[in-house]
Amino acid sequence: MTDTTGKLRAVLLTALMVGSVIGAGVAFTGGAAAANASDLNDYQRFNENTNYTYSTASEDGKTEGSVASGATIFQGEEDVTFRKLDNEKEVSPATLSRTGGSDEGVPLQMPIPEDQSTGSYDSNGPDNDEADFGVTVQSPSVTMLEVRNNADNDVTGGVLNTQQDESSIAVDYNYYAAEDLELTVEDEDGLDVTDEILAADQSGGAYEDGTGNNGPNTLRFDIDPNNVDAGDYTVSVEGVEDLDFGDATESASVTISSSNKASLNLAEDEVVQGANLKYTIENSPEGNYHAVTIDSSDFRDSSSGADAAKVMRSVGDTVDTGLVVDNDSTTEIVDDYENTSISDVDYAYAIVEIDDGNGVGSIETQYLDDSSADIDLYPASDTEDAPDYVNSNEELTNGSALDGVSTDDDTDFDVTQGDITLDNPTGAYVVGSEVDINGTANEGTDDVVLYARDNNDFELVTVDGEKSIEVDSDDTFEEEDITLSDGDKGGDDILGLPGTYRLGIIAKSDAVNSSGGVKDNIDTSDFNQGVSSTSSIRVTDTELTASFETYNGQVADDDNQIDVEGTAPGKDNVAAIIIGSRGKVKFQSISVDSDDTFDEEDIDISELRQGSASAHILSSGRDGKFGEDTANSISDLEDEVGNYTSGSPTGDQIRDRILSNTVDDTASDDLIVTQQFRLVDGLTTIEATEGGEAGGSLTVMGTTNRKADDNTITVELLQGDASIEINSTDEWNSDGQWSVDVPLSNVEPGNYTVEADDGDNTDRQNVEIVEELEEPDQTTVDQPENNQTMTTTMTETTTETTTEMTTTQENTTENGSEGTSDGESGGSIPGFGVGVALVAVLGAALLALRQN
């Protein structure tokens, strides 16, 4: 190492040391100075990448000064300078750009706009290389603003008593490194009372002038509510300079009261019976317990002990509910609600705790009378105005605990009747049919009951064996596929007979007796006084339609099956009975679908002999039984009909016995549909053909008595034993007429045979396929002189030639000129027209033939 090199290194080392000392002590414009992180004051920002920072706020709390790389800045800030720590060089905000996101590459602006995109910005922007300077932009926000009483409980939105002289306003916000926070308190007239309500001495980062900064810790402004008048106040906070917009500000309200008594506030003055009524206890210190009661005189007459126990709901801040009885001999808290007589109940109570500034509870009005009801609020337990009536389990101590205690507040509210509607069934109802029952009820109605009325009282209608229908949480009710006449109650019987009646729906709470059971009947006056509605319903008798599928009145014994379809509203099933001429019987039960239709395919009739037969559909009618007392069900009827076949009776005898014991029986309302048919051999025939031109098609038509869909008729074009073309069909109507088109695109002219085959039966017919079908050739000849047209039709056969001539009189034109044929001149040879010449030629040809 040379002396020169050593000297240079020494000089360089000395320069670096001096520069470090200078860099550690330099003060920048605006009061910014480098310091160790542990010595920073509340106004300084931390540089997360180093132990150094630059102050960004002067002593008056305003944003001025410089920040170094890694600092966090906020939307809306002004007067912020970026400087490098190592050389004090100022960095232009425009050189920093967004490093990622949908706005990647967008430059940073100064002043920072209120809508500047949040996130990181650096000198490299979206590039991955390490940047020499970068900052992070955040949205300024107040994250918490609460008014707290002496016990440090949140009473925001509630009541702060003037005696709470150690109350405070607590704030959390994220821009403490950029700006101080400013507090403003206004009364209900908008007058600023901040200086008046602030306590003389402040701590927790607050200053006497209503500003403050406690860094990352909660900022507290100490207040004395006794310094201001009672009333409603609004508390607001925001940044002292730039950050006074959007989420950087927050407001809250509080009611300052000089009263020592708690107050009761109802959510509504009028409520529909069955709805829940919210109440709020205000103006009471945090943690107090208050008793709220409703006297039994406001209960519904039909309420039971269990119902009364539900009046005060165990929700919100309610910690205990119950009933107190006073039966002259004792006053006590009820343990057994089910066995408690409503006449012994004195009142229902709730114990409510004051939490977050107030106490919230709720009343179930379903069990209150539809009139005006009173609610009482008692002083807090264990205070100068009331004894300690709440035990350590947060329960009322005993039934006499509130005796002799004056209330802090009382108020009343009106309970009105609600609405209930029955949307279905309405209009017409077929006896025995299934319907959907649905409708709507007002809030708080848990169950509804269906009734029917003829002339007197409303009679109970059971719903699938139940006496009531549950109301869903959306205040609707529905039961599907219900037979209204199925039960054994009076209303079921009413709806089992044709006529016009009143159908009613009523809240279950209005339809129960003193023991809580649903009443079997309710007189019209009581029904109308309850939460109910009625509509008219017309009950009609059952009906029956049916059609058996035959083909031209026949059923082929090759099939030995028959189909039937029809309608039977109000029935679950019907009986199909097919009777042969020799006394054979086929009996089958057929189910009726929910849409009142039935459809049964492939009923086996193989036991029947050929000949005439009858098919019947038999329904039991609205009474559900066959005949007067022949059979009570389809299965019973099947056994009965089986008895009719003993002794080798004829088909007519069996039919007579069935009719006499069902539809023709005394007082019977049975219904029957009868259809005659013949059971015969299967037969498929060819009746006619059309077409037959080579290259075209041949249509083959015929009749059959075979069952469509289950059978296929195949038509084959044969030449000798060779099959030329084939086609088929499995569709034809009840007249048995079928049709098949056989393609002739590859068939040469000649004589052929067509064969129709249904699988069991065949039929044949000879046909001729020609090269071209003959069509009449018409020539029109004009006769211009007499305005006539002659049409000659020639048909040539092997034996003779026939010439027909017809003339038609043409209409003359409007100007009287003679008609002419299209495209021809109106002139002709006088006396010797083309028509005359044609006749002459034909005559000569005929003469030549006769000579030959």
From Swiss-Prot:
PTM field: N-linked glycan at Asn-36 consists of a glycosaminoglycan chain, constructed by a repeating sulfated pentasaccharide block composed of GlcNAc, GalNAc, Gal, GalA, 3-O-methyl-GalA, and sulfate in the molar ratio of 1:1:1:1:1:2; the other N-linked glycans contain Glc, GlcA and IdoA.
Location of the protein in the cell: Secreted, Cell wall, S-layer; Cell membrane
Residue positions of motif PGF sorting signal: 830-832
GO cellular component, as recorded: extracellular region; plasma membrane; S-layer
TM helices/strands, residue ranges: 829-849
A GO biological-process term: cell wall organization
Keywords: Cell membrane, Cell wall, Cell wall biogenesis/degradation, Glycoprotein, Lipoprotein, Membrane, Proteoglycan, S-layer, Secreted, Signal, Transmembrane, Transmembrane helix
Residues of the site described as Not glycosylated: N51
Domain of life: Archaea
Keyword Signal found: yes
Record's signal peptide: 1-34
Residue positions the entry lists as glycosylated: 36, 339, 398, 438, 513, 643, 727, 751, 787, 789, 791-793, 795, 797-799, 801-803, 806-808, 811-813, 815
Start-end of Polar residues biased regions: 115-126
InterPro entries with a match to the protein in the record: Csg_halobact, PGF_CTERM, Surf_glycop_sig_pep
Annotated region (Disordered), positions in chain: 84-131, 772-828
Ranges of compositional bias, category Low complexity: 785-823
This protein's record includes keyword Lipoprotein: yes
Function per UniProt: S-layer protein. The S-layer is a paracrystalline mono-layered assembly of proteins which coat the surface of the cell.
Family under the similarity heading: Belongs to the halobacterial S-layer protein family.
Protein known as: Cell surface glycoprotein
Source species: Halobacterium salinarum (strain ATCC 29341 / DSM 671 / R1)
Gene designation per UniProt: csg
